[in-house]
């Protein structure tokens, strides 16, 4: 890893560090523990709505024995015009050690990490349409548990490619780990940045070949009104319907970062079907975030060897 006290992008992670984090997350899932060198304080600063990521970080922090400080953006001084930098300097000054941050600005963390006075351990909980490293890593853990490897796996990422930070993080890491990528969904959402990672295909043309179907939420809140497509039209043309699921191999799994728009990206009856790993992803997320936090705290000598 390039920055030892922050995990903000999968681009900074080496393949070996990813596999080490997966191994440690799987150990936590089996009951492994760690010991703090002193009381450690955490805060989760989310400037966009979140259920899974925020509560998953909090559960991970509590399982590791951290004291979790509350923060709500709408009742903080951010509502009075305070900058993110000043908010985090305040958090640092009162004695917080670790922060998970979600912010609508892409690369919000660049200026923070360039500031020599900033020494909080930081996990990026999502930046705009940029990166979502913890979601990507829990996805990698879920795939690894299923197949034991990544090399040669065929993965199709389907849905709102243009606005998805999950797509960007996952395509970067999956390609490096040896998977073969395809993209499906409206062709106008497939932009030039995806060309280096895989080809755009019609979903129906590859269903019988893929090992993993990675579905993406349609992010209505990021669309201009002119871009919208009805939910029904999307489901018929690009969604994982029962008819499409029947064409998949018995060993194929499907993932979704959630929240799920049922009967849009995926048919309602498939969300909890035997080949779905959607709720397993959420379960694994706690253990992967434990592994990430432990790694960062070790760099600050806050975890005993």
Swiss-Prot record:
Q: What class of enzyme is it?
A: transferase
**Gene Ontology molecular functions:** amino acid binding; aspartate carbamoyltransferase activity
Q: What is its EC number?
A: 2.1.3.2
NCBIfam families annotated for this entry? Answer: asp_carb_tr (TIGR00670), PRK00856.1 (NF002032)
Which residues take part in binding carbamoyl phosphate?
A: 52-53, 102, 132, 135, 258-259
User: Record's HAMAP family?
Assistant: Asp_carb_tr
Read off the PROSITE patterns from this record: CARBAMOYLTRANSFERASE
One GO cellular component assignment for this chain's record is: cytosol
UniProt pathway: Pyrimidine metabolism; UMP biosynthesis via de novo pathway; (S)-dihydroorotate from bicarbonate: step 2/3
List the Pfam families.
OTCace, OTCace_N
Query: Which PANTHER family would you find in this protein's record?
Result: ASPARTATE CARBAMOYLTRANSFERASE, ORNITHINE CARBAMOYLTRANSFERASE, MITOCHONDRIAL
Which key words tag this protein in UniProt?
Pyrimidine biosynthesis, Transferase
For this entry, the protein name equals Aspartate carbamoyltransferase catalytic subunit
* Entry keyword Transmembrane helix: no
For biological process, the GO terms are: 'de novo' pyrimidine nucleobase biosynthetic process; 'de novo' UMP biosynthetic process; amino acid metabolic process
**Gene behind this protein:** pyrB
Instruction: Fetch the Gene3D superfamilies from UniProt.
Output: Aspartate/ornithine carbamoyltransferase (3.40.50.1370)
- SUPFAM superfamilies the UniProt entry points to: Aspartate/ornithine carbamoyltransferase
The function of this protein is: Catalyzes the condensation of carbamoyl phosphate and aspartate to form carbamoyl aspartate and inorganic phosphate, the committed step in the de novo pyrimidine nucleotide biosynthesis pathway.
Q: Reaction catalysed by this chain?
A: carbamoyl phosphate + L-aspartate = N-carbamoyl-L-aspartate + phosphate + H(+)
Q: State the family named in the UniProt similarity comment for this chain.
A: Belongs to the aspartate/ornithine carbamoyltransferase superfamily. ATCase family.
Q: Does the keyword Transferase apply?
A: yes
- Binding partners and assembly: Heterododecamer (2C3:3R2) of six catalytic PyrB chains organized as two trimers (C3), and six regulatory PyrI chains organized as three dimers (R2).
The residues listed in the UniProt record as binding L-aspartate, with positions renumbered to this chain, are: 80, 165, 217
């Amino acid at each position: 890893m390039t920055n030892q006290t922050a995990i903000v992008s999968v681009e900074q992670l080496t393949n070996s560090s990813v596999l080490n984090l997966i191994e440690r997350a799987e150990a936590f899932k089996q009951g492994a523990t760690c010991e703090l060198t002193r009381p450690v304080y955490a805060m989760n600063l989310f400037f966009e709505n979140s259920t899974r990521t925020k509560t998953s970080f909090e559960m991970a922090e509590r399982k590791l024995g951290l004291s979790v400080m509350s923060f709500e953006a709408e009742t903080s001084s951010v509502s009075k015009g305070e900058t993110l930098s000043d908010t985090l300097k305040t958090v640092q000054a009162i004695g917080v050690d670790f922060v998970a941050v979600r912010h609508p600005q892409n690369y919000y963390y660049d200026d923070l990490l360039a500031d020599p006075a900033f020494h909080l351990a930081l996990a990026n909980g999502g930046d705009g349409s940029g990166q979502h490293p913890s979601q990507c890593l829990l996805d990698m853990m879920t795939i690894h548990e299923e197949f034991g490897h990544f090399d040669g796996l065929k993965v199709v990422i389907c849905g709102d490619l243009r606005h998805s930070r999950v797509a960007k993080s996952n395509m970067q890491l999956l390609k490096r780990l040896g998977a073969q990528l395809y993209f499906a969904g409206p062709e106008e959402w497939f932009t030039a940045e995806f060309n280096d990672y895989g080809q755009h295909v019609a979903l129906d043309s590859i269903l019988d070949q893929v090992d993993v179907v990675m579905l993406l939420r349609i992010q209505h809140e990021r669309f201009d009104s002119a871009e919208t497509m009805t939910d029904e039209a999307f489901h018929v043309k690009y969604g994982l319907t029962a008819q499409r699921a029947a064409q998949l191999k018995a060993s194929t799994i499907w993932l979704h970062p959630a929240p799920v728009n049922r009967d849009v990206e995926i048919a309602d009856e498939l969300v909890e079907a035997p080949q779905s790993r959607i709720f397993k992803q959420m379960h694994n997320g706690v253990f992967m975030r434990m592994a990430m936090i432990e790694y960062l705290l070790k760099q600050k000598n806050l975890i005993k060897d």
